[in-house]
């Protein structure tokens, strides 16, 4: 009503002014319509508008439609009964089942390959060389470090990746900086990367822990007694030794939930002889990761710690590109056990294998995965060790090798209770452990079975475990990323 009276007064005032100025009636009507239109449009703008006094909400802005990440497929939200619900034939223990639901996420089509993991290795190599190019003890070249912005203001020093490394035609100092990361084999005389120096340092903010009720009163200033927290920190000693340790201390600020980790990222190529001590596997030790012939085979010999570091690097690598355009993306990570199982079973509780039937061979008699169908029968499926990715058909989501080939790390901590400790909504059970914690606490869930396992152990509903600092010739991994809300 108030708006209506206001508009009538505006009409009367406008008419009187136009008449006084001897403007013709037709032109008067046109001008009055424009005035009233402007008044009404102004009244509908902003939070204080008068759209009948209704709650209309604010402008939502632009919703980013996330494109499909390279080499990934979308696993759509779904529900399954997780676990086999059968009695273990060896121990006589019934493995529990649990109905669970999982939201949308992107998942790598294949296991991470040797070629993809080498990109990580070479990035770490190049970052160390660039650090040494800028180090006065080596080349001392300021161009390799950015210390100020475009306006000349100081910034946190960081590497300048736009300056190429002078692999050829370099100075004596530059050559020394490059060679400091290499060594010569004392027996063969071959020049090779010094894998012991390939350390990757990363930080992460434990947002979930910081949000817990036991910490919030102190952080918000409503409590004075500081609760105890565990904080991961890492450093390198003067003699080059990496030290990762967990500190327990009173909470002082939100920064106590920022953790640091330093991980040596080179795969354990000796796993081929240590996993099979009475076997002639030296060829795989020398060639499986190094030889280009295995470039598209799944990387193995990586620990859970290394796989997690790879996910952190992959996130860093992507965000440095897309953040320049103002785009925010979720981080890459290892899948939870629930995510992995739902993806492998095509979100169908009846599926025990990714291909939907209980038969391990197709109608034509061909094996449907790379596994060990009988004692010593590794080559029955035409593959002796991990096969090239995509050697077998994908499941309905478009995921390859979710059974056999290389077993895969998950983010989930292993307990005998299985999924009983987890929520039924996006379930996860994950614990941080210190280097000196007992072995059982270090175990992580491994899914999918491998090239060396029999048919029972490559079922999607089964689970295995391994210590988080052990690299095995049968364990690899793939990454996932939560889909951004609003994407189609």
PLM features: residue spans?
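Sec-dependent N-terminal signal peptides
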Residues: 30-37
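Short, structured beta-strand segments at or near domain termini in extracellular proteins/domains
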Residues: 473-488
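C-terminal motif of bacterial Sec signal peptides marking the signal peptidase cleavage site
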Residues: 40-41
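Non-catalytic, alpha-helical, charged scaffold/linker segments
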Residues: 136-246
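Functional-site microenvironments in short loops/helix caps that host divalent-cation chemistry
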Residues: 46-52, 74-75, 81, 86, ...
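Post-signal peptide N-terminal segment of mature Sec-exported envelope proteins
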Residues: 50-77
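Positively charged n-region of N-terminal signal peptides that target proteins for export
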Residues: 21-29
